Amino acid sequence: XYNLLTIEDIDVKGKRVLVR
């Protein structure tokens, strides 16, 4: 997922990124 209200671990082009 992707949720702007939560910190979620998403896979972008094979890289693990932290989205806040």
Swiss-Prot record:
<dbReference type="GO" id="GO:0006096">
    <property type="term" value="P:glycolytic process"/>
</dbReference>
<dbReference type="GO" id="GO:0005737">
    <property type="term" value="C:cytoplasm"/>
</dbReference>
<keyword id="KW-0808">Transferase</keyword>
<keyword id="KW-0067">ATP-binding</keyword>
<protein>
    <recommendedName>
        <fullName>Putative phosphoglycerate kinase</fullName>
        <ecNumber>2.7.2.3</ecNumber>
    </recommendedName>
</protein>
<comment type="similarity">
    <text>Belongs to the phosphoglycerate kinase family.</text>
</comment>
<keyword id="KW-0963">Cytoplasm</keyword>
<keyword id="KW-0324">Glycolysis</keyword>
<keyword id="KW-0547">Nucleotide-binding</keyword>
<comment type="subunit">
    <text>Monomer.</text>
</comment>
<comment type="pathway">
    <text>Carbohydrate degradation; glycolysis; pyruvate from D-glyceraldehyde 3-phosphate: step 2/5.</text>
</comment>
<dbReference type="GO" id="GO:0004618">
    <property type="term" value="F:phosphoglycerate kinase activity"/>
</dbReference>
<dbReference type="GO" id="GO:0005524">
    <property type="term" value="F:ATP binding"/>
</dbReference>
<keyword id="KW-0418">Kinase</keyword>
